[in-house]
């Protein structure tokens, strides 16, 4: 838990394929992975919540526990209604070089790049997705969104004209509305060298 919390509100995840650990915020008191059931299940204890069902003759002032079915649907559905499960993925910074020899395409950041368009390659897209191109002139600077972004992508979007320019570019794909889900394919940009300053 965070230092000001008395309940579990953080999680750690290990990616076996890449050998990488990540941390995140996730309020869960207990968790059981898929195996006995088709999906993982978890509980979350909320100390200031009243249970949704009454207990005859007892006033519960100790809070309530919620049961979650993970990896099931695209939204969070409970007694309070349906809310979106916001998610995003962001690439690392990448740069380009003006070298044409395939053996020397190391992306050394010598040149600025002009990103004319983003070409969506969603294998699955339910609802919309938001694309943000972050551009940066130097590694120690704070990356900013391209002037025209963020961009909304639908299942009928062929391309997005971006007019982004920077030495370093990273891409964020996000969803923040109910009923949205996506699976992305290959990153596709129309980019070219655009000078040294």
Please name every model-derived segment.
Residues 1-197:
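Beta-sheet repeat architectures centered on beta-propellers
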């Amino acid at each position: 838990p965070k230092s000001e919390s008395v309940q579990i509100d953080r999680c750690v995840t290990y990616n076996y394929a890449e050998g990488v650990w990540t941390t995140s915020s996730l309020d869960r008191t207990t968790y059981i992975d898929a195996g006995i059931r088709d999906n993982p299940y978890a509980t979350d204890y909320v100390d200031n919540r009243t249970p949704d069902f009454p207990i005859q003759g007892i006033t519960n002032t100790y809070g309530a526990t919620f049961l979650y079915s993970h990896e099931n649907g695209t939204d969070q559905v409970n007694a309070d209604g349906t809310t979106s499960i916001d998610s995003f993925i962001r690439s690392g910074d990448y740069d380009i070089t003006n070298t044409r020899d395939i053996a020397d395409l190391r992306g050394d950041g010598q040149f600025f790049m002009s990103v004319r368009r983003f070409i969506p390659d969603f294998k699955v897209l339910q609802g919309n997705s938001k694309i943000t191109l972050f551009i940066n002139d130097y590694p120690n600077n704070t990356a900013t969104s391209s002037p025209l972004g963020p961009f909304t992508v639908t299942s009928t979007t062929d391309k997005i004209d971006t007019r982004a320019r920077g030495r370093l570019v990273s891409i964020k794909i996000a969803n923040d509305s109910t009923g949205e889900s996506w699976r992305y394919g290959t990153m596709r940009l129309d980019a070219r060298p655009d000078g040294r300053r």
